[in-house]
Amino acid sequence: MFAVGLAALAISGTVVYADIIPMILAVGANADAPLTDGPASVTFRHLTTTPGDVGTWHYHPGYVHNVVTAGTVKIEDGCGETSTFTAGQAFETSEGRVHRAINEGSVDAVEYNVFIRDEGKPLTRQIPGNVRRCGPPSTVRECKHGGWSKFDFPNTFRNQGQCMAYVLLRPRVSLLVPEDPLQ
């Protein structure tokens, strides 16, 4: 029945987004996580993006560390930047930046993801209507030379100063840099 529904959508000319297959491997609670400066939910996920799939526009309200173990995945930022990662490479999708995953290859792209987020926050928030959004800005540099004008998520900015203030006033966590005491 599911295959018939997909065939009907394809025939009608409607774009069918993403046969992206997530599998939650483990979920745990960390009572005092440095990345969230308090209690955090930690989730391990296995994600398969099949050839030709284009994910929906979304963001993650927390930290996400990703490792590609097979195939190639392209991450398209809502502001137009793209990065491509192949098996053996790792990347982050953090700070609430809008993005989507694309598999332009001929084999499955397989990733393992670790989500670290404030307790009670979801893994992912979908952008309503699957509309491309740019933002939020992560650095003051992104606000300069007219860069402020491209951002429309979570809101627009009237000028460079307003964009820079948004970046500078975002909550931050300070972490000690881990050291190997024997080296």
Locate the predicted segments by residue.
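Histidine-centered metal-chelating micro-motifs
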Residues: 54-56, 74, 91-102
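Bacterial N-terminal signal peptides
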Residues: 1-12
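Sec/Tat-exported extracytoplasmic proteins
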Residues: 46-47, 51-53, 72, 77, ...
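Soluble extracellular-acting proteins and domains
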Residues: 122, 132-183
